[in-house]
Amino acid sequence: MASLTLRCDSTHLLPSRDVVKGTKPFGTSLVYPRIISKKFNVRMRVIPEEGDVFSSSKSNGSSMGIELQPDLVSFGTLAAEMIPTTMDSPEVEDEEFDLDRPTDGFASIPQAIEDIRHGKMVVVVDDEDRENEGDLIMAASLATPEAMAFVVKHGTGIVCVSMKGEDLERLELPLMVTRKDNEEKLRTAFTVSVDAKKGTSTGVSARDRAQTILTLASKDSKPEDFNRPGHIFPLRYREGGVLKRAGHTEASVDLTVLAGLEPVSVLCEIVDDDGSMARLPRLRQFAQENNLKLISIADLIRYRRKRERLVEFTAVAPIPTMWGPFKAHCFKSLLDGVEHIAMVKGEIGDGKDILVRVHAECITDDIFGNSSGGKQLAIAMRLIEENGRGVFVYLRGPESKGIDLSHKPRTYNTNSDQAEGVSFPVASREYGIGAQILRDLGVREMKVMTNNPAHYVGLKGYGLSISGKVPLITTP
């Protein structure tokens, strides 16, 4: 693939850049097929076949103009960093030279997209380094009674329909609980359940469920077309899809959009014959027996990040801190315009064994430091300074889980100040913005500073891996 390199003197920050927008496959300008850059003191690379989802750390600059090989620019995967003229920055090779190549034992994403387009189901595994749970997924607009009978026979019976927020709002389907009150393990965004009023009886049969799903998928449906509660469970899709949250909800809609269909999909977890959740070996056997494509969310992440981005680099500057000097790398979210900061210490080099902390913004903790969140921020920065090499990613705004200011003081009455949950760490499935930032900084293998025992899913899709975890010990 190609690379775009701009080298200018490093005496000024990036003043301006003109972007010619391209296609918008997911409703937001995530793909930039052409980039026209004015003079600025930044080195930029269009990274071959690279792109993005998680969080943490990551030539001298005489003016040379532009070196361009054009075939890669269409994917819009642009990384950029300000570089002092006195520093050398080694090129980081992409270990995953072909982001379209599926993981061994899995079908390719284009094969799955083609099946979705023709109304077939695919089996999607959430993360092969996690629990390997699999979902049956198909386009909601192509649902049939026969397909629903198959889903109910081989699934949990909880049939869900993943939808975008604007469609849920159009149908007046609110979340079952508010986001801050969502205690479900994976923070899946369930809305109230529904049945279609027309063409159904009890709502539970395969035919009735198919009718409800088709009604949900129809652009002509209205709020009054549904009974509440019912037997189909709509789920709210996170904008940005698997590049934002590495879950089945997002994967299912991404697949239907890539197939050129309405952004509404059916999904149901697969169970084994004994009623337990089917794991990867059994899922592979199940897919073969039923002639279904088996894909992983990690592969879908790789497929999308080759073509799209969620963040763009804006500037970098040296910043003195109470712990020592760092470089602040600023990135802007293309989803909501929120700017995030990566505080980098030392040289990323080969990207291995990097000490990393991903921290969600919390004003009361971070500024006033009265709870574990502020203490953990300070400890993480100190550890990075002592280590001489590391990255602290500070995710702002919506990335901090949308916690309102009134909610935080109420947590002080719960006696849970010692738990990391009070500091609102980023959910393990919602590292999309941070993962792209880390990848752009050159991070490949990291030691994550966290007190959270949860596994982080979807990292493989970004070429990221965790070599260890470092606890952040705070004192009362």
Swiss-Prot record:
Site (Essential for DHBP synthase activity): 231, 269
Tissue expression summary: Expressed in leaves, shoots, roots, flowers and siliques.
Location of region: Inactive GTP cyclohydrolase II: 307-476
Cofactor note: Binds 2 divalent metal cations per subunit. Magnesium or manganese.
EC number assigned by the record: 4.1.99.12
Top-rank lineage group of the source organism: Eukaryota
GO molecular function, one term: GTP binding
Disulfide-bond pairs as recorded: none
Localization in the cell: Plastid, Chloroplast
Residues holding D-ribulose 5-phosphate: 130-131, 135, 245-249, 269
Gene name linked to the record: RIBA2
Binding site residues for Mg(2+) 1: 131
Organism in which the protein naturally occurs: Arabidopsis thaliana (Mouse-ear cress)
UniProtKB keywords: Chloroplast, GTP-binding, Lyase, Magnesium, Metal-binding, Nucleotide-binding, Plastid, Riboflavin biosynthesis, Transit peptide
Sequence positions that bind GTP: 357-361, 376, 399-401, 450
Entry function: Involved in riboflavin biosynthesis. Catalyzes the conversion of D-ribulose 5-phosphate to formate and 3,4-dihydroxy-2-butanone 4-phosphate. RIBA2 and RIBA3 together are not able to complement the loss of function of RIBA1.
Cofactor section: Mg(2+); Mn(2+)
Transit peptide: 1-54
Region ranges (DHBP synthase): 44-306
Name of the protein described by the UniProt record: Monofunctional riboflavin biosynthesis protein RIBA 2, chloroplastic
Pathway assignment: Cofactor biosynthesis; riboflavin biosynthesis; 2-hydroxy-3-oxobutyl phosphate from D-ribulose 5-phosphate: step 1/1
